[in-house]
Amino acid sequence: GYRTTVGVSQNAPFDRTHCTYCGQCLTHCPVGALRERSDTEKTLEAIADPDKTTIVQIAPAVRTAWGESIGLYKEESTMGKLISALRQIGFDYIFDTVYSADLTIMEEGSEFLEHLKERDSHRWPMFTSCCPGWIRFVRTEYPEFTANLSTAKSPQQMFGAISKTYIAHKLGLDPDKIVSISIMPCLSKKYECSVPE
């Protein structure tokens, strides 16, 4: 019928469900009726705004697979071509998320070493905090393990913070005029960007 709606259990808002925002419902919908939210218009508006500086980060998985969606062979879809395309679209600065992933790993490693020094005052094992879907899964399904999660930001969140501090300082940019954009392979990253923590 024309009044049919699709929603989560008991029509609860998504933030009150156990949904991890993994996107599997989108990939497995037999008729393709479900779609992710597109932020393309917001991105293009930021690029067109002369008062804004757009800084984009590219996830490693995107870097290796971006050409498939436009019919390029693996050998043709190089990082150079991707950067060139992003520059032609109008992005001001382009970074690889590998940079902030290294920072996250160093942060988690330091935290782990601190935990080792004071074993009795920390919960074990220590879990990574890199994936927002994983974080949400632990918080909703196994809240007793929330204290086991690393306090380090994910690579995406780490880069967002660095783009408004270190990179802004190095490039002489006003942090309030920076629009940090992520090109990621995972829908839970959109959820992560919306979480105020």
Predicted stretch roles:
Residues 8-18:
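Short linker/helix segments within small regulatory modules
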Residues 1-2, 11, 61, 99:
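Short, ordered loop/turn segments at secondary-structure junctions
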Residues 1-5, 18-42:
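Iron-sulfur cluster-binding cysteine motifs and their immediate structural context
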Residues 8-9, 23, 66, 143:
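General secondary-structure edge motif
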Residues 12, 22, 79-80:
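Generic non-transmembrane alpha-helix signal with a bias for helix starts/N-cap capping motifs
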Residues 9, 33, 149:
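Short, flexible active-site loop motifs that bind/organize anionic cofactors or intermediates
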Residues 1-9, 158-161:
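Short, charged low-complexity linear segments at domain edges
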Residues 36-197:
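Iron-sulfur-associated redox domains of electron-transfer enzymes in respiratory
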